[in-house]
């Protein structure tokens, strides 16, 4: 298991695309993709974000066709922490993107893991404050929920 969490390396999800050459020659049995939320803070439209994820999936399938893909929904974030100003007012973009990702996964026969509802405050699109320390990244309790959800799918 290797994590390629890149944070703001390229400030765009295409940074992952550009680094696939580090992963794909090993023809991994499985890849879990949880990408796109950083792009929201860079003012990319939902269509652009989904298109970049689609390009990433196409490249993985071309260069490592036997790799089983798991496309995870974007996680919610919580603006009340005030740390990520560029996400302000954009909470409702996440379910919109997730809806498009789920449709894409269904069209392409890719396993889709809908994590979003596991992490939101009831009746909102906001990340539960007890699952984060900064409003964006999961804390230990958040990771426990994530791991449990992933294990159910594999």
Give the role of each language-model region.
Residues 8, 38-46, 87-88, 132-136:
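Second-shell loop/turn segments in exported
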Residues 46-56, 94-97:
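Charged helix-capping and loop-helix junction motifs
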Residues 32-34, 58, 70:
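Conserved, well-ordered alpha-helix/loop/beta-strand core segments that scaffold catalytic motifs
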Residues 64-68:
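A short helix->loop->beta-strand "cap" motif at the edges of active sites that frequently abuts
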Residues 7-8, 34-37, 72-75, 115-117:
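Active-site-proximal beta-strand/loop segments in catalytic clefts of secreted hydrolases
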Residues 1-10:
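Single conserved hydrophobic/aromatic residue that forms the stacking wall/gate
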Residues 14-50, 74-79:
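Oxyanion-hole/transition-state-stabilizing segment in secreted/luminal serine hydrolases
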